[in-house]
Amino acid sequence: MNSHHVIPVTAPGIALRGYGAIEETDLHDFHQIVLGLDGEMVMTVDGVGERIDQGSAWLIPAGARHDYAGIGENRQLVLDLPAAALAVPERLFNTARAVRIDPALTKLVRKIAQRAALAAPPS
């Protein structure tokens, strides 16, 4: 199991992430949205697998096991959302699912990613 989140998520968070070719597994008590930016990754949530690229995303409910691996160079915008957050519609996370992203929304995701990159501490 991956331990990206040892500390409980009590407020929404945003991060830019890239994933390696070796498959990892995660399970946590908060909702997550993984939006493709560059390259591709493969993700399986509750037994359903899909590729994520710049035109797609995964909606992952709290408590859903997900297995994932990057395909070559890749980068995703990851939103971590507390399961009890009032601002998150409960029906959005009734079930895990991959979704296609509208091209206009893809542009917005890129702008958010650029701002997140500027705000991130140097690694």
Predicted regions located by residue number:
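Short histidine-centered beta-strand/loop micro-motifs
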Residues: 21-28, 68-71, 90-91
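Short acidic-glycine-tyrosine-enriched beta hairpin
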Residues: 47-63
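Ligand-binding loop in jelly-roll beta-barrel domains
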Residues: 63-86
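Generic protein-terminus/edge-of-domain signal
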Residues: 1-50
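A cytosolic small-molecule/anion-sensing beta-strand core signal
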Residues: 37-38, 53-54, 72
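Short hydrophobic beta-strand segments that form the core of ligand-binding sensory/regulatory domains
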Residues: 57, 76-82, 107, 111
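Amphipathic alpha-helical segments enriched in hydrophobic/aromatic residues interleaved with Lys/Arg
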Residues: 86-123
